[in-house]
Amino acid sequence: MDISGFLKENKESLKDLKEDDINEILEDYEIDNINDPKQKIRFFKQVENTRKRLKIEEKNRMLEEDINRMYEEEKNRMLEEEKKEFLIKVEEEKKEFLTKVEEEKQKLKTEVEDLKSIILTSSTKNGDLKGTTSYSELFKIKNSLKLIEENCEFKDWNIPSGIELKKHVINLDDCNQESTMQSKLDEYFKDFNKKRKLIITNGTKIKINSIISNRYCDYFINQKGFPFEPYWMHMVGDIKKGSISSDTNLDQVLKYIDIIVEKSNHHVLNRPMFGFLMNKTKIKFVKYDIENNKYYITIDYDLRIGFQYLSNIMIYLEQFIRNIPNSLQTILKNHTNDSVEFYYGATSSVFIVNKEFVYKWFNYPYFFQTEVKYLTFIDGIEGTPSIKQQNQTENWIQISPRGQLIKNLEGKPIDISFYTKVFCRNTQKHTSREVIHRDIRLSNLLMDSGGDPLLVDFGFANFTENEEFYQGTMNTASNRIYNILINNRTNHAFSVVESDDLESLVKVYIMENEQAVKRTIKSIPNSEIGLFRTMWEFFNTECFPQYSTLFQQAQNINYEELKNEFIKIDKIKNTTTTSNNNQNHTNIHKNTIANTTSYTNTLETSTTNPNTNTTTSDTNTSTTSTTNTNTTTSNTITA
């Protein structure tokens, strides 16, 4: 019997061994006669030894698996403990931040009350303001020691890279959408500031080549002259609608209102200027009187605008009402007891009725047709808002049947980071269909009363394969588009790119958080700046590998240069503030010397003229008292 026959005959005895194990045994022995009893004993003894060896190897393998499993469990337990500690620390920082916010709110309330007191004092003293003093002027007087000499210039509006933005990302459980947005954050910061500085340093006129045609050619100048580029005002308005506000940008908005109203006395306002004026004064239609065909209007003075602007505003408002389409006026008249808010843009206007219906009226049929075209392409007919078009002359869309952009959902503040993620996801939705919006800015990001985010105003939308002139808002244009325009190229026709919309969304997010970002960077000690890169590396490799792109970008930011830039700006402000303080101190010192001299003259007069001592002394004492009172009033206004 040969070897194959032998193996076949003893198949049951060898069934638990693999073919490789049996071949290995056969190689160890030269078996001439496989049926020899001694040879068979030796063979099966070797088979038994092989079985024992395999069992030992199996036990070792299982033991090694148990050790690895225990190691992984211990590692996961330690990571879970570290995660809990991290979340506790984040919660403590959040509470501390909210406490500071409440303190700032209380401080602002106190400031408003002081301002009201000044206004009442001025009214009592002068009998009435009578249109001679605006709220903005009083506000600037009150804050004169806090603001820099030219507080309405753009030079203090530096948009920093966002360490605070990345902190928000870490605090969220599911926000990997932001990693795509923020991967180019540092590059946007540099180019975005380049444009601002160019406008300031090059004097009164900087011509940007025509974007669409000659009639849209814009001139950028400072706020002391004309013509005035409307989109800079629009950007200021967008920032004011956000969550970050400061004395500096509030004064800028007030200054713009002053300029626009002054211009309206001599020139016809274009639509963006008029829209900015309407939005910032917060005019609302309250009720329509059917019998007398009149609108009763209320104005919210939250922005502290002056009384003398009211007549100018009413004139332009009446002109605008007459141009509203009849079909839309019918809708407004049906809501006679409801509040109707108006928001104005260069291509369309939005009407919010009773916070339940939002209507959008287009100034030109082209933009109406474009918006309907791309909304239908993205969402289909069923997902497209209600659309109405009459006789090719009246074009409007019902944007949302459930309401408007709101500040709170069920009493809870809006989480900007969360909704930015949602807007980013919506942006990726239409870019995946090869459609770009081309005009992403804060006023086009809405949210209805049900909490659903809306990206509106597709009037400038286009397909990515098309080549044509750029249309949209310059301030939030993508980095690529901005470089083309800022380099003064004569031909602005280029293929649009899907990432353009995403970059615009990043710029909107930066403007929303610029103050918080700046405070965070400035608070880092110089000796600890290097730790930030180590921190991002730890998060990248150990905790949140899904945010790899974001953390790698965070490691590359030049924090030293960024902090030095902030400190340099603060030094300029502090120098100006110190100069103003010294000037005020000198004026007070002069008043004190004058009062002392007056009192000395009183004593000399009393000694020289004893017969008129009582009368003269009483008179001079009264004069001194009046002078001191005026000094006190002056200090109150400039404090």
UniProtKB/Swiss-Prot annotation:
Domain Protein kinase: 233-588
Positions with a binding annotation for ATP: 239-247, 284
Enzyme Commission code: 2.7.11.1
Organism: Dictyostelium discoideum
Active site (UniProt): 439 (proton acceptor)
Keyword set, alphabetical order: ATP-binding, Coiled coil, Kinase, Nucleotide-binding, Serine/threonine-protein kinase, Transferase
Region (Disordered): 601-639
Gene Ontology terms, MF aspect: ATP binding; protein serine kinase activity; protein serine/threonine kinase activity
Protein family membership: Belongs to the protein kinase superfamily. Ser/Thr protein kinase family.
Protein name: Probable serine/threonine-protein kinase DDB_G0282777
Reactions this protein catalyses: L-seryl-[protein] + ATP = O-phospho-L-seryl-[protein] + ADP + H(+); L-threonyl-[protein] + ATP = O-phospho-L-threonyl-[protein] + ADP + H(+)
EC supergroup of this enzyme: transferase
Superkingdom, taxonomy of origin: Eukaryota
Coiled-coil zones: 7-122
InterPro entries: Kinase-like_dom_sf, Tyr_kinase_AS
